[in-house]
UniProtKB/Swiss-Prot annotation:
Disulfide bonds: none
List of residues binding Zn(2+): C16, C19, C38, C41
InterPro entries named among the record's database cross-references: AAA+_ATPase (IPR003593), ATP-dep_Clp_protease_ClpX (IPR050052), ATPase_AAA_core (IPR003959), Clp_ATPase_C (IPR019489), Clp_protease_ATP-bd_su_ClpX (IPR004487), ClpX_bact (IPR046425), P-loop_NTPase (IPR027417), Znf_CppX_C4 (IPR010603)
Annotated source species: Pseudomonas fluorescens (strain Pf0-1)
Protein name: ATP-dependent Clp protease ATP-binding subunit ClpX
Function per UniProt: ATP-dependent specificity component of the Clp protease. It directs the protease to specific substrates. Can perform chaperone functions in the absence of ClpP.
Subunit text: Component of the ClpX-ClpP complex. Forms a hexameric ring that, in the presence of ATP, binds to fourteen ClpP subunits assembled into a disk-like structure with a central cavity, resembling the structure of eukaryotic proteasomes.
Any one GO CC term of the record: HslUV protease complex
Gene symbol of the encoding locus: clpX
Domain of life: Bacteria
Length: 427
């Protein structure tokens, strides 16, 4: 029935049949058979439908678990090299979520354990990026924690349960979603025991944190304050079961290769001793591939903690060729990102191959891996990004080796200019 109230001159004042607003209170009133609907109600209906569609898509994608090969293939789009680590991660993550998908089905006598992961590799080799990409691929909540900020409960610093609180924040405190999430704990090697021998002094940021993390990683019900804040007795807590949360720990473990080499090298004295030259020494990545749980214990992790991380994946050091690939090949490659920024100003950005090689060399010298690439490019392009928005006539910027080495300025090519391009003005 048409909703009309109080006549107006020759016509009747029309009202929305859903919210009751008059035609003067809304921008548009759409007529139907004996009903009217305003533009505000149409927008509200669209929002409701959009939310339901997104939830249905998320639910269907959660049930469809990609195979290990598919997981590895997607990782290839973002992470260069590290094939062995990708394979280990793909299998471990696939088995973990396969276990979760089967948990509601008819149980038998076989109980599948959780396979938490330990990533070992040099700085800038892709540990964090691998974990982030996995979480994005699986559409699950993901958070990163820094092990160096953690302390035992009762001491100044972050409590280990703050990790779960961060995970809850990522999914708007939806406990069910959080219990299916992934937690990446970085710098895990920094909480190694300070010495092999137990000390009478309390190690609240080393072995103490390992002890505190044990139950959380293995599986426990953590009490987390709602909406953050510190705990107090009168407060209600959110109960989060961590049994199904996948924990990935990562660290550079600098010096671990020496522990491995000492174990694997058979020493001797006298005429029968084996003499090794320095050239025969293995690269760090090659040594790390031979890591065993006992090596991690000697490094400073307690045996119980090592036992909670049954899946080990090692990452290799990135060489010059790999760094050049990282600059150009991944979906989110740095050269593509900067080219996009310049494109927004209507300018083409070109990196010559010798420039990319020079950037890779400088990153190797800094020993920061892929992490150092952005800071190098940011420094090189700073003046150009400062000038370009004020120079509408520039159509292209060319970066070569001499620019990276600081010997010359980037080459600016102007619209309607002759083939010989002008050099960039001094800053």
């Amino acid at each position: 029935m048409t909703d009309t109230r109080n006549g107006e001159d020759n016509g009747k004042l029309l009202y929305c049949s859903f919210c009751g607003k008059s035609q003067h209170e809304v921008r548009k009133l759409i007529a139907g058979p004996s009903v009217f609907i305003c533009d505000e109600c149409v927008d509200l209906c669209n929002d409701i439908i959009r939310e339901e569609v997104q939830e249905a898509q998320a639910e269907s994608s959660a049930h469809k678990l990609p195979s290990p090969k598919e997981i590895s293939g997607i990782l290839d789009q973002y992470v260069i090299g590290q094939e062995r680590a990708k394979k280990v991660l793909a299998v471990a993550v696939y088995n973990h979520y396969k276990r979760l998908n089967q948990r509601d089905k008819k149980a038998d006598d076989v109980e599948l354990g959780k396979s938490n992961i330990l990533l070992i590799g040099p700085t800038g080799s892709g540990k964090t990026l691998l974990a982030e990409t996995l979480a994005r691929l699986l559409n699950v909540p993901f958070t990163i924690a820094d092990a160096t900020t953690l302390t035992e409960a009762g001491y100044v610093g972050e409590d280990v349960e703050n990790i779960i609180q961060k995970l809850l924040q990522k999914c708007d405190y939806d406990v069910e979603k959080a219990q299916m999430g992934i937690v990446y704990i970085d710098e895990i090697d920094k909480i190694s025991r300070k010495s092999d021998n137990p000390s009478i002094t309390r190690d609240v940021s080393g072995e103490g944190v390992q002890q505190a993390l044990l139950k959380l990683i293995e599986g426990t019900v953590a009490s987390v304050p709602p909406q953050g804040g510190r705990k107090h007795p009168q407060q209600e807590f959110l109960q989060v079961d961590t049994r199904n949360i996948l924990f990935i720990c990562g660290g550079a473990f600098s010096g671990l290769e020496k522990v491995i080499q000492n174990r694997s090298t058979k020493g001797g004295i006298g005429f029968n001793a084996e003499v090794r030259s320095k050239e025969e020494g293995k690269k760090v990545g090659e040594s790390l591939r031979e890591v065993e749980p006992d090596d991690l214990v000697k490094f400073g992790l307690i045996p119980e903690f090592v036992g909670r991380l049954p899946v080990l994946a090692t990452l290799d050091e990135l060489d010059e060729a790999a760094l050049m690939q990282i600059l150009t090949e991944p979906k989110n490659a740095l050269t593509k990102q900067y080219a996009k920024l310049f494109e927004m100003e209507g300018v083409d950005l070109e990196f010559r191959s010798d420039a990319l090689k020079s950037v890779a060399k400088r990153a190797l010298e800094r020993k920061t891996g892929a992490r150092g690439l952005r800071s190098i490019l940011e420094g090189v392009l700073l003046d150009t990004m400062y000038e370009i928005p004020s120079q509408s006539e520039v159509s292209k910027v060319v970066i070569d080796e001499s620019v990276i080495e600081g010997k010359s300025k980037p080459l600016y090519i102007y619209e309607n200019s002759e083939p010989a391009a002008k050099a960039a003005p001094d800053a």
